Curated annotation (Swiss-Prot):
Lineage: Bacteria, Pseudomonadati, Pseudomonadota, Alphaproteobacteria, Maricaulales
A single Gene Ontology CC term: HslUV protease complex
Pfam families per record: AAA_2, ClpB_D2-small, zf-C4_ClpX
GO molecular function, a single term: ATP binding
Keyword Metal-binding: yes
Quaternary structure and interacting proteins, as annotated: Component of the ClpX-ClpP complex. Forms a hexameric ring that, in the presence of ATP, binds to fourteen ClpP subunits assembled into a disk-like structure with a central cavity, resembling the structure of eukaryotic proteasomes.
Binding-site positions, Zn(2+): C17, C20, C39, C42
Record-linked CDD domains: RecA-like_ClpX
UniProt similarity note: Belongs to the ClpX chaperone family.
This protein's name: ATP-dependent Clp protease ATP-binding subunit ClpX
Domain ClpX-type ZB residue range list: 5-58
Record: residues binding ATP: P121, T122, G123, C124, G125, K126, T127, L128
Length: 423
C-alpha cells in the first residue's frame, strides 16, 4: 500500500508495510505481493511465532498428554475387539509423549523407551491398529514393510530408508522426526531361515535383524534426503533414533506350534504322557508366548531383547467379524451402502447374511482381511447391472445369497404413472 500526505510528490511513491504500517525508509527490506507489502521485521516476527508453535507441538505440557483411556477410546472407534493390544499401545504411546516431556526437563534420570512387538494371526487388526494410531498422533508416523528390507550393499531397501520415510512424514524437520513412531509390518518374515550356518548370506533375514538393532536401540543414522544410492554426491542428514518408538508386528505363522511343543517332553515309551493335539484357538496359544519361543522361531536374541513389550492379538470370532462389518466408522457395510447411494439405491444386509459372511471368512482363515473379497464376490453381478437398472429402490442380501443359492432381492419403487392410473 502507498500513502500520500499534503500532495508531497515524494510521499506519493512511498510504500508502507501492510501489517505494521512502517514505511520503506524505516525498514531494511520491503517484500511486495499482490497489492500488499510486508517488511522484514514482520517476517521475522511471523517466524518466531511459528517456531514457538512448533516447540509447543513437539513437547506438550503435562496436561496436554493424551491419556491412555483417550487413545484407547479413539482406537475403539475404528478397531473391534483386541482390548489387550489396544491397552498396550495406548500406554506405550502415552509414555512416549511423557518421555518427550521428560527429556525437555533436563532430569538426571534418563527414561528408556519400550519398543513393542505385536503378535497375532492374519487379519486380526495389527496393521489397522497402526494406521489408526497415525490418525490420532501428534508426532510423525510412518509404516514400513520388513519383507522389502535387505542388508546395506544389496539390492533392496536399506534399513536407513525407514528413517528417511519418517523424515519425509515430518516434512524433513529432523527435530520432529527424532520424536516419531515407526511401525514395521511382517517382522516375522525376516526370521532366521535355519539354525545351521550356511556359506550363503541371509541378507533378508538375520542380516536385516542385525541392521535393525542399532536404529531400534538408538543411534545417529546418516540419511540421504533423496533416498537410495542414486545420488552419491548428496549431503546426508544426521537423525538420532534414540527417541523414536518402534512398533513391530507379524502373524508368526507356526509360532503356536512352537509354544504348544514347549514343555511336552518325550511321548515315547510305556510310561510316556500321551497328550492330544492342542485344540485351543491360535490366539489363546499365542498369549503364552515367551522370548525363548521367539528365539526358536528364528529371531536373534539381540533383536528380541530390544522388544520388551509383547502384545498378542486374538482370533476374531463370528460376533467380532459381524461387528467389524457394521460398527466402525469406516465399516465395510457402510462403504458399500455409500457406493449404492451414489446410484440412488439402498443396500440392506440381513442378520443371517452378516453371520454367513463371517463364517466364510473364518473358514478361509483370513480374518477381517477376507471380508472385502467375500463382499465383492457377493455384490459383483449386482454392481455390474445396477447403473443400467431402472426403478430399483433397494437391494436386499440375505443368507441364501451369501451361500450362493439365490440372487440379491431387488425392490422396485412404485412408478408415478401407475399411481396416477390407480387414482
Amino acid at each position: 500500500m502507498s500513502k500520500t500526505t499534503g500532495g508531497d510528490s515524494e510521499s506519493k511513491n512511498t510504500l508502507y508495510c501492510s501489517f505494521c504500517g512502517k514505511s520503506q525508509h524505516e525498514v531494511r527490506k520491503l517484500i511486495a505481493g499482490p497489492t500488499v507489502f510486508i517488511c522484514d521485521e514482520c517476517v521475522e516476527l511471523c517466524m518466531d511465532i511459528i517456531r514457538e508453535e512448533n516447540k509447543s507441538s513437539l513437547v506438550k505440557s503435562k496436561e496436554g498428554v493424551p491419556s491412555p483411556q483417550e487413545i484407547f477410546n479413539v482406537l475403539n472407534d475404528y478397531v473391534i475387539g483386541q482390548a489387550h493390544a489396544k491397552r498396550v499401545l495406548a500406554v506405550a504411546v502415552h509414555n512416549h509423549y511423557k518421555r518427550l516431556n521428560h527429556a525437555s526437563q533436563n532430569s538426571d534420570v534418563e527414561l528408556a523407551k519400550s519398543n513393542i512387538l505385536l503378535i497375532g494371526p492374519t487379519g486380526c487388526g495389527k496393521t489397522l491398529l497402526a494406521q489408526t494410531l497415525a490418525r490420532i498422533l501428534d508426532v510423525p508416523f510412518t509404516m514400513a514393510d520388513a519383507t522389502t528390507l535387505t542388508e546395506a550393499g544389496y539390492v533392496g531397501e536399506d534399513v536407513e530408508n525407514i528413517v528417511l520415510k519418517l523424515l519425509q512424514a515430518a516434512d524433513y524437520n529432523v527435530e520432529r522426526a527424532q520424536r516419531g513412531i515407526v511401525y514395521i509390518d511382517e517382522i516375522d518374515k525376516i526370521s532366521r531361515k535355519s539354525d545351521n550356518p550356511s556359506i550363503t548370506r541371509d541378507v533378508s533375514g538375520e542380516g536385516v535383524q542385525q541392521a535393525l538393532l542399532k536404529i531400534m536401540e538408538g543411534t545417529v543414522a546418516s540419511v540421504p534426503p533423496q533416498g537410495g544410492r542414486k545420488h552419491p554426491q548428496q549431503e546426508f542428514l544426521q537423525v538420532d533414533t534414540t527417541n523414536i518408538l518402534f512398533v513391530v508386528g507379524g502373524a508368526f505363522a507356526g509360532l503356536d506350534k512352537v509354544i504348544s511343543q514347549r514343555g511336552q517332553g518325550s511321548s515315547i515309551g510305556f510310561g510316556a504322557d500321551v497328550r492330544e493335539p492342542d485344540a485351543r484357538r491360535t490366539g489363546e496359544i499365542l498369549r503364552e508366548v515367551e522370548p525363548d519361543d521367539l528365539l526358536r522361531f528364528g529371531l536373534i536374541p539381540e533383536f528380541v531383547g530390544r522388544l520388551p513389550v509383547i502384545a498378542t492379538l486374538e482370533d476374531l470370532d463370528i460376533g467380532a467379524l459381524v461387528q467389524i462389518l457394521t460398527e466402525p466408522k469406516n465399516a465395510l457395510v457402510k462403504q458399500y451402502q455409500r457406493l449404492f447411494e451414489m446410484e440412488g439405491v439402498g443396500l440392506t444386509f440381513t442378520e443371517d447374511a452378516l453371520k454367513a459372511i463371517a463364517n466364510r471368512a473364518i473358514a478361509r482363515k483370513t480374518g477381517a482381511r477376507g471380508l472385502r473379497s467375500i463382499m465383492e464376490g457377493i455384490l459383483l453381478e449386482t454392481m455390474f447391472d445396477l447403473p443400467s437398472l431402472e426403478g430399483v429402490e433397494e437391494i436386499v442380501v440375505n443368507g441364501e445369497v451369501v451361500d450362493g443359492n439365490a440372487k440379491p432381492l431387488s425392490i422396485y419403487a412404485e412408478r408415478k404413472d401407475d399411481k396416477r392410473e390407480g387414482a
